[in-house]
Regions:
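Low-complexity or membrane-interfacial segments used for flexible interactions
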Residues: 2-61, 65-73, 80-85, 91-201
């Protein structure tokens, strides 16, 4: 297990069932809640709030899309004071087949997120549409994504869909990290990507 900036990896992501809009809990390797994520329902533009607690009393970040559903939408991450922390951008046409995102800070690209094998997600979506068989799709196919600091560099985080009935589960695994590296912005960016990719299937 790797302790980075109060987060002990791996991190487990679980979507709550029967909720208007997505609800996502993030726990660390000890089972401690790291984030509670709420995606607002019935919004033309994506709007997400990341809280430090499940009671939703301590907001940490707000993520808002810059436009109504668009292949190249940018998602602005701000702190409680409204200051920009980062911008997550889905790279348009390239993301139709294989998910590809960039994370920007101060106009510079600081992280790149990529899907490992797009065929896995395609098969997962096909099987999920078959009655009865769809109940087991979550145990057969596990789409995975990586986050690195630049194109072609070794990934520092890996995100994998986990086996689960009826609910979405993902895991964020630490890979090539320095002992003092802070990844809070990276993890929050991953949460936005997971919300978007889950909606895509």
């Amino acid at each position: 297990m790797c302790y980075i900036s109060r987060m002990e990896f791996p991190l487990d992501l679980r979507f709550k069932l029967m909720a208007l809009g997505s609800r996502l809990t993030v726990t660390d390797a000890r089972g401690t809640l790291v984030y509670y994520v709420k995606q607002k329902a019935f919004k033309l533009k994506e709007s997400v709030t990341v809280f430090a607690d499940e009671g939703q009393t301590r907001p940490l970040y707000t993520i808002n899309a810059d436009r109504i559903v668009d292949v190249s939408a940018r998602y602005r991450v701000t702190d409680p004071g409204g200051s920009e922390v980062a911008v997550v951008q889905r790279l348009g046409m390239r993301s139709f087949w294989k998910a590809h995102y960039q994370v920007h800070q101060g106009g510079q690209t600081v992280f790149v997120m990529r899907e490992e094998n797009p065929w896995i997600k395609v098969l997962d979506g096909i099987v999920s549409a078959i009655p009865i068989v769809s109940l087991f799709s979550g145990y057969i196919f596990h789409p995975a994504y990586t986050l690195s600091r630049a194109e072609g560099e070794a990934p520092i985080l890996r995100i994998v869909k986990r086996p689960a009935f009826f609910q979405g589960r993902f895991r964020i695994e630490a890979m090539h990290l320095s002992a003092t590296e802070s990844l809070e912005v990276a993890v929050v960016s991953v949460l936005m990507m997971v919300l978007l990719e889950r909606m895509r299937g």
